[in-house]
């Protein structure tokens, strides 16, 4: 997490709230920082409260929304997308813009800095010309990008005041210590991993059972697929939501896993049975 751009995002949220702007109802928002220290310096700066008012509450830390754990869309929005076959957009400050990654119904995904994510959320659309079009209207007054964007001096003064090395040292001091639920997990100490036959998350793959040290040459190899444009690794092996109707979903259902506990392909990468059923299923 880049503290400078996150502080900028908080300042934009503060100005937006003070000017009376709100995120439109059809825009779903979430905030998943890469580190817990982010919450502390945003709270210390008095900015998280403004992000919360715009709907950017912290939903977790690390890979959450960007891996597909974004939760459901509003029912009306979902029905409109499916009925009218709409190409709707998500915009994130993560590092993946794959089709369907954020949500199966969201085809287009754009990457942007955190401040721009806030700005686009406020505008409620992706096809906006920030140079000439207003982001929103409050009390009859048009609000433009220039009205919300903080100055470099403002950001510099705030970062110098808030970002102290002690803040990071304190948060990373016990980096390997979890909460009470994590610490309560009972595990056997051993030099090798204790495979569980019942786990649907981590399953011992059979591929190395007959491992041989003998190396052989490969002759006349051929590509499995030759693909056109806009094909991503997610089309080959998805990382997002597991649908109940998919082969991977059926596999989990047969093992008494409920639909709301399917999680994502990304979270079940340690189970080859799930992943092989997800191949080319995007």
Q: Can you say where each PLM-predicted feature lies in the sequence?
A:
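Mobile "lid/hinge" segments at catalytic clefts and subdomain interfaces of large enzymes
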Residues: 2-28, 57-175, 179
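Generic short alpha-helical hydrophobic face used as a protein-protein interaction/packing hotspot
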Residues: 55, 121-122, 256, 279
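Glycine-rich and small/hydrophobic secondary-structure elements
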Residues: 49-56
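Non-catalytic terminal/interface segments that mediate subunit docking, oligomerization
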Residues: 1-42, 46, 181-282
């Amino acid at each position: 997490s880049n503290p400078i751009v996150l502080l900028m995002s908080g300042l934009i949220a503060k100005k937006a709230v003070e000017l009376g702007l709100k995120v439109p109802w059809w825009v779903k928002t979430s905030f998943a920082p890469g580190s817990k220290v982010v919450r502390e310096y945003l709270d210390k700066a008095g900015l998280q409260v403004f992000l919360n008012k715009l709907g950017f509450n912290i939903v977790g830390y690390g890979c959450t929304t960007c891996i597909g754990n974004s939760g459901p869309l509003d029912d009306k929005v979902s029905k409109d997308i499916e009925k009218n076959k709409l190409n709707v957009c998500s915009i994130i400050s993560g590092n993946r813009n794959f089709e369907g990654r954020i949500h199966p119904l969201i085809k287009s995904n754009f990457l942007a800095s955190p401040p721009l994510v806030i700005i686009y959320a406020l505008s409620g659309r992706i096809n906006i010309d920030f140079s000439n079009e207003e982001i929103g209207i409050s009390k009859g007054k048009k609000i433009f990008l220039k009205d919300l964007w903080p100055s470099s001096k403002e950001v510099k003064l705030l970062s110098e005041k808030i970002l102290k090395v002690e803040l990071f040292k304190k948060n990373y001091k016990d980096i390997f210590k979890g909460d009470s639920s994590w610490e309560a997990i009972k595990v056997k100490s051993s030099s090798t991993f204790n495979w569980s036959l019942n786990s649907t998350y981590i399953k011992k793959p059979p591929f190395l059972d007959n491992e041989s040290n003998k190396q052989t040459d490969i002759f006349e190899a051929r590509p499995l697929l030759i693909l056109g444009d806009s094909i991503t690794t997610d089309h080959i092996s998805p990382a997002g939501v597991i649908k109940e109707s998919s082969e991977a979903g059926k596999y989990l259902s047969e093992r008494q896993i409920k639909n709301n506990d399917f999680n994502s392909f990304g979270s079940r990468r340690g189970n080859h049975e799930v992943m092989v059923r997800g191949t080319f299923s995007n």
